[in-house]
Structure formats: structure tokens, C-alpha cells
């Protein structure tokens, strides 16, 4: 209960413990906070030793009420107070957003400096729905971003310095209790490959230097030091467009250490690409997919339902074609429902009544139906943009669209079988289910003028994915000399579960338990006996090259290569 005290002849009301103040007891607010943190950590240790359930929220609430704290201690403060002897046991209880490293990798998103969209020179304008960029209402933001997304705000605080962005984000994830031994960079902020070569080299060099701590003179030196750093760069993703994903661009991205491309497709209809001012054809998308996959890259496509002049039936047909046509069949997908944002051409159409978004409930139904079509070899990375809702004039109204769509699928008796939903780490976090009987599963399909084999270790009864490998028998679009002739290429090897250091082992975790080696052995067998290849290449992250050396591979250009007997 609140109490009243006399101060300077006036009655002052004291807040109740936990209701905006802190109890006296001769403690300052800072001292009360320190004692509360100490008590929270001590209680967690005691309950852990007694094998009792550690309910962090209940423990925090009790301590805050006891010491009258209006604001609960931050996770980073509690993590810092953990004794070294208890960190391994209690860190999972304190880790913020465990999903961030559930796939075994800490993702670090960085942004290049704001620059104009390259197709303005040919089409005279940007895409009709695209916010951001130097000429927009959000002038200090990069193209297609508003400057208010979490990654954008971190980039602006760092003044778009790549080293500061990377180092500060890695340190932040570490403070939040995540393992940062394996890092994947995602380069966002418009068409990176359209920027001058000098700036691109500066940007990539600083990303690798942020891991190694070395100050490099060029990209080659930065990559060489990054290969031996304690924090490994196991992959790099670059956002690009089909017209900046040709042979010379692909070669340069391989030198950077890039392993995955995110390509803006948006629609499989030529008329929609023209009407929205994309600046490229859908045929160009299919061509660049062929080139990228034959160079070994993983390909993630961006698709946008609810574009102007499409409608529900055409949207569903577009996604059906995307998943079933050999011209597309990307390895990953980001679904970005169309948003109306101030300052875009679409905003003007919306203001005059010439464009209207799907109603929210209908959009949830559409996304649910799209997710039910996803084949088991495709990973759905995102289901909506992370643009803050107050900046959205019309479109998605809630920030948990994936969750709503999955709930709708349950209602309709549908199931999502994409890679992310079935990952062992995600299943463990969301459903507390672990794989029991794991077996090798093989799926073959044609895509982009080549033959794809998707190998995986799965618990087929519980539908849990433990690890995967993407093997491709190269088609006729090979541009890299290292892969010419009778050659197969491993485009991805990934074992899921909470991150374990590259040379480490943890009996309770799936990484480094031998699944990767078994997948590589099967891939080599298929390449030798079925593809009739005399060489197999791997597009390897810079920091994982030592792993492949132990399997008998050698560095040849940007690839790890092994000659098959």
C-alpha cells in the first residue's frame, strides 16, 4: 500500500513497491537494482540445483516487488551477473529471442549507404510500391527501407560504417546470451552490386575485419584473415536484382565470400513487372536463377502478393507457378505482402481509390494457402516486412502475420512443411520436441536447367529436420572455370540446432555430431556414380573452409574442391 511522508511541510505520496518507486531501507535506486539482480540470479541457481522449474518472469516480478523497482532489470544485466560456473546451465533461460540462433547461426544484418535505384536511369522512376531512398520522404534511408526498421536504425547510428555496424551487432548478440562463434552477414539496403567497386571492396573488407580484428589493405587479405578468426563467417547474403546478377557480378560476389543471393522477383507475371516499373522482365529472373545456381549460390526470392491489377486468383496461380515451374523453384522465399507507404507511387493510387489492399482476414487466408504449397526443400525466411506499423497507410495491420497464418492453417487442416517450420532448433523452442529416430531422406527435382538433389536427415515420424544438403549437377550455364566439365556442386550444407563453435562439440546439441560428414559422403557418392562427375565443388563460407579441408577438399579459386576417383 502507498504511504505518505512529510517533506518540507508538504505531504508527499510514496509509490508502492513495484509501482514506480523503490523501498527505502537506506538504499539508493541503483543499490536496490543491484540487490534485485543478485537475488534473481541466486534464486535461479538454487532452483536449478534442486531441478525445479526456473520461471524467470515470476522470479523477476518477486524481486522487483520486494525492492520496489518500477523497471525490471535488463537481460544483459542479469547475464553479466551470472557466475562462470553456472553460465552454461542458466544462459538458455536468459537468452533473449532464442530463435535468433536456433538454426545454429547468428545472423548479422548490415546496410550499405543510401543510393538511388539503378533502374531509374532506364525507366525514369523507382518501383511503384518502393519507399525510402535519397529522393524519398525518408531521405536518410536506403532504397526500399524507411529508416525506422531495427537494422536501419542500427545502420544510421553507425553512420552506415560497415565495421561499426558488424562489430556492435555481434557484441549486442553476445551480451544477450547468443553464441557468436558462427556469423552470417546479410547485406541489405538496395542493389549492392550497383555501387562503385571501390565502395563495395571497402564495405566487404570491413565486414571481414570486424570478425578478425585485422586491418586489411584489400578484400583478398581480409578474407584470408577472416578464415582464421575465432568468430567464423560461415556465409554471406547479398540482396540484388536480376540485372545485377550476371556472370561478372557472380564472380565478384564469390570473391567477397558470398554464398547466398536474395533476388527481387515480386511477381511471375510480365504485365505486373511492367506496370509496377520493375525495370526487368520475368524472363531475366529465370535466366539469373540458372546462372546463380550453376555458380553454386543458394537463391532466395522475394515475392509480393496483393500487387496492383492482380487479385486473389492470379496471386495463387503466381505462387503455384513459382513453386512448380522449373524456371523458378528457389531455395528460399521471403513473402512481402504489398504495403501502401507515404511518398510512393502506390500511395497516390490508393489516395485516388485506384488501388485497395486485401482485407486483413483475407490476407491471412491467402498467406496460409501459400504456405501450404511450399515444398519441403524450400525455406520461408520471412512473411512480412519489418516496417513499423505506424508508417503503413494500408496493408498488413499486425506484426505476427506468420503466426496468424499458421493458426489459420491449423483451422483448415493444412500443414506447412517448409524447412524453417521443420528445423530441429525451431521445433525444440516452440514445441519442446526433439528428434528420436533420424534417417536419410532424398528428394530429386529439376530446376533452372539443372538436376537438384535435396538430401536431409529427418525424424520422419515427427517431421523434424536435423540437417540438409543441396547438390546440383551443373547445367549448361556454368560461368566459373572451376566448375566446368564433369562437375557437381554442393550449394548448401547445414545442420540445425543451437549454434556450436566450428571445432567444438556438445553431446546435447545436433551440430558436430557427424550428420554433416554423412551428408557429404552421400553427395560424393551421387556425384561420382549418378552424375558421372570427376570433381565436386562446395561453395563454402570463408570460415568453414577448414571443415572441408578435413574432408579432403582443397581451395580452388573461391570453391573448396575434391577430385573424385
Swiss-Prot record:
Tree of life domain: Eukaryota
Tissue expression profile of the protein: Expressed in meristematic tissues of in roots, leaves, seedlings, cotyledons, floral buds and shoot apices. Expressed in the shoot meristem and the emerging leaves immediately after germination. In the root, expressed in the transition zone and the upper meristematic zone.
Gene Ontology MF terms: 4 iron, 4 sulfur cluster binding; metal ion binding; tRNA binding; tRNA uridine(34) acetyltransferase activity
InterPro entries (UniProt xref): Acyl_CoA_acyltransferase, ELP3, ELP3-like, ELP3-like_N, Elp3/MiaA/NifB-like_rSAM, GNAT_dom, Radical_SAM_C, rSAM
Locations listed in the record: Nucleus; Cytoplasm
Ligand binding (acetyl-CoA): 182, 492-495, 515-517, 548
Family from the record: Belongs to the ELP3 family.
Subunit composition and interactions: Component of the elongator complex which consists of ELP1/ELO2, ELP2, ELP3/ELO3, ELP4/ELO1, ELP5, and ELP6. Interacts with IYO.
Chain's role: Catalytic tRNA acetyltransferase subunit of the elongator complex which is required for multiple tRNA modifications, including mcm5U (5-methoxycarbonylmethyl uridine), mcm5s2U (5-methoxycarbonylmethyl-2-thiouridine), and ncm5U (5-carbamoylmethyl uridine). In the elongator complex, acts as a tRNA uridine(34) acetyltransferase by mediating formation of carboxymethyluridine in the wobble base at position 34 in tRNAs. Promotes organ development by modulating cell division rate. Required for auxin distribution or signaling. Required for meristem cell cycle activation at the time of germination.
Protein name: Elongator complex protein 3
Organism: Arabidopsis thaliana (Mouse-ear cress)
Amino acid at each position: 500500500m502507498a504511504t505518505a511522508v512529510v517533506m518540507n511541510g508538504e505531504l508527499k505520496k510514496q509509490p508502492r513497491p513495484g509501482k514506480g518507486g523503490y523501498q527505502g531501507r537506506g538504499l539508493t535506486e541503483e543499490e536496490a537494482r543491484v540487490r534485485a539482480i543478485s537475488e534473481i540470479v541466486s534464486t535461479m541457481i538454487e532452483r536449478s540445483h534442486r531441478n525445479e522449474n526456473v520461471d524467470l518472469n515470476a522470479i523477476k516480478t518477486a524481486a522487483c516487488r520486494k525492492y520496489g523497482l518500477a523497471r525490471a532489470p535488463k537481460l544483459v544485466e542479469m547475464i553479466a551477473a551470472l557466475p562462470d560456473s553456472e553460465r552454461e546451465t542458466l544462459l538458455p533461460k536468459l537468452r533473449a529471442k532464442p530463435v535468433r540462433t536456433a538454426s545454429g547461426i547468428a545472423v548479422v544484418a548490415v546496410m550499405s549507404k543510401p543510393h538511388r535505384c539503378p533502374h531509374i536511369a532506364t525507366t525514369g522512376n523507382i518501383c511503384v510500391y518502393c519507399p525510402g531512398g535519397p529522393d524519398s520522404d525518408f531521405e536518410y534511408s536506403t532504397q526500399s527501407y524507411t529508416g525506422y526498421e531495427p537494422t536501419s536504425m542500427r545502420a544510421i547510428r553507425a553512420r552506415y560504417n560497415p565495421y561499426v555496424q558488424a562489430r556492435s551487432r555481434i557484441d549486442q548478440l553476445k551480451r544477450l546470451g547468443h553464441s557468436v562463434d558462427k556469423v552470417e552477414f546479410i547485406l541489405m539496403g538496395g542493389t549492392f552490386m550497383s555501387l562503385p567497386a571501390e565502395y563495395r571492396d571497402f564495405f566487404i573488407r570491413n565486414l571481414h575485419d570486424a570478425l578478425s580484428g585485422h586491418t586489411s589493405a584489400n578484400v583478398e587479405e581480409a578474407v584470408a584473415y577472416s578464415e582464421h578468426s575465432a568468430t567464423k563467417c560461415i556465409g554471406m547474403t547479398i540482396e540484388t536484382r536480376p540485372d545485377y546478377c550476371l556472370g561478372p557480378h557472380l564472380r565478384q560476389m564469390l570473391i567477397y565470400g558470398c554464398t547466398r543471393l536474395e533476388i527481387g522477383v515480386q511477381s511471375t507475371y510480365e504485365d505486373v513487372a511492367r506496370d509496377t516499373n520493375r525495370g526487368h522482365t520475368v524472363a531475366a529472373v529465370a535466366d539469373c536463377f540458372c546462372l546463380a545456381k550453376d555458380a553454386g549460390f543458394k537463391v532466395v526470392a522475394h515475392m509480393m502478393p496483393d500487387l496492383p491489377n492482380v487479385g486473389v486468383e492470379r496471386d495463387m496461380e503466381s505462387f503455384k507457378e513459382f513453386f512448380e515451374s522449373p524456371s523458378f523453384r528457389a531455395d528460399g522465399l521471403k513473402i512481402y505482402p504489398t504495403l501502401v507507404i507515404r511518398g510512393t507511387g502506390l500511395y497516390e493510387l490508393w489516395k485516388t481509390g485506384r488501388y485497395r489492399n486485401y482485407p486483413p482476414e483475407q490476407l491471412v487466408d491467402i498467406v496460409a494457402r501459400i504456405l501450404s504449397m511450399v515444398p519441403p526443400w524450400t525455406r520461408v525466411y520471412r512473411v512480412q516486412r519489418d516496417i513499423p506499423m505506424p508508417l503503413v497507410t494500408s496493408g498488413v495491420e499486425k506484426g505476427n502475420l506468420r503466426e496468424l497464418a499458421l493458426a489459420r492453417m491449423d483451422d483448415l487442416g493444412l500443414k506447412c512443411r517448409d524447412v524453417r517450420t521443420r528445423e530441429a532448433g525451431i521445433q525444440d523452442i516452440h514445441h519442446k520436441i526433439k528428434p528420436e529416430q533420424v534417417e536419410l531422406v532424398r528428394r530429386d527435382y529439376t530446376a533452372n536447367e539443372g538436376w537438384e538433389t535435396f538430401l536431409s536427415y529427418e525424424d520422419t515420424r515427427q517431421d523434424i529436420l536435423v540437417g540438409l544438403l543441396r547438390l546440383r549437377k551443373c547445367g549448361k550455364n556454368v560461368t566459373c572455370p572451376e566448375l566446368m566439365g564433369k562437375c557437381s556442386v554442393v550449394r548448401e550444407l547445414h545442420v540445425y540446432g543451437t549454434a556450436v563453435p566450428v571445432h567444438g562439440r556438445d553431446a546435447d546439441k545436433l551440430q558436430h555430431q557427424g550428420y554433416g560428414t554423412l551428408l557429404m559422403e552421400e553427395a560424393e557418392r551421387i556425384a561420382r556414380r549418378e552424375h558421372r562427375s570427376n570433381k565436386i565443388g562446395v561453395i563454402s563460407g570463408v570460415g568453414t573452409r577448414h571443415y572441408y579441408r578435413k574432408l579432403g577438399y582443397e581451395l580452388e579459386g573461391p570453391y573448396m574442391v575434391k577430385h573424385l576417383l
